[in-house]
């Protein structure tokens, strides 16, 4: 026992809890850093410090979290991570602060709610461009890593079963060495009041 350790105190490893959606790499990193994995059969339901999963938590789970526990999602963050909700918030901000600040946002339609608006815009642009092809991109609202994305020029090829967004496809993107690219930056948001963000020093550039 260390000299400055209170009598009777024992240092226990931090415990992380996962579900079937938690990536293996997350578990491996936590184990390498000395964490212990939560065992529902051996431990009480409150004997964990971090619950990490890909899906969001219900508000009741946020309310009932103990002082020694953390969840890897803040309440309400799906408003930013779901493509349809993000689009609605950006459009609302555009109305509040003016279009010039939001020129980076291509024309966006949330389907099926904006279907009539999209059809009107589609045929309006088709009439203006005449024989020239115009491309649109359709993205499922809740999927990631390029899953379910389609690019189309003919509205007959538009097929969707769930909520999605349709955006004007950017045909002249920024290229680096004639390749498309994007940046992936990793951050940890620890709070919103005040907004506190830690940016990881290393990121990815994808081509």
Predicted regions and their residues:
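Conserved N-proximal alpha/beta basic substrate-recognition cap immediately N-terminal to
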Residues: 2-135, 142-144, 157
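Catalytic core of tubulin tyrosine ligase-like
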Residues: 117, 129-207
